[in-house]
Amino acid sequence: MRVAVETQGSRWQDWLLDIDDVTLSPKPPSSGMDTDWSALDQIIERLQADQSRVRRISLKVVVFDDADLAYAKEVHRRYPGVPFYLQTGNADVADSDVDALRAKLLSRLEWLVEQAAESEELADVHILPQLHTLLWGNKRGV
C-alpha cells in the first residue's frame, strides 16, 4: 500500500519519512499567512536526503490572484528540481449553485492556464482545478 499526504510544509514531522508521496502546499499571500522558508527548506532537504525509500515529493500552490501567482513563481524558483503544481482556488465557498460555481472555477482555471502559458518561469508546471469542487460544488463531507 502506498501512502500520500499533503501538508502546508510549516513543521517537520518524523513520520514524513514513512510517506510515499509528499505534497507540500505552502500558503500563498491570500491566506493571510506568512511562509516559514527555513522550515520549508528543512523539510524538502530532509525528504530529498533520505534514501531509505523511493518517495515522490512535489509542491503545490493554490492561486486566487496575481499576488498568489507571484508567490508561486517565487516558490518554483526556490525549489527548481521539485515537481510543481498550481491549483485554482475557490473563493466562493458559500455558493450552492453548482453550475454557476463550476463556470466561475473554469473561468479562473482558464485565467491561470493563460498566465502560466505567458510565463517562461512556469513552462514546466502542472495546472489543476479543484476537482472536488468541480464535482460536488461546496458540498460538505465529500
Regions flagged by a language model, labelled:
Residues 1-142:
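Conserved AdoMet/S-adenosylmethionine-binding subsite of the radical SAM
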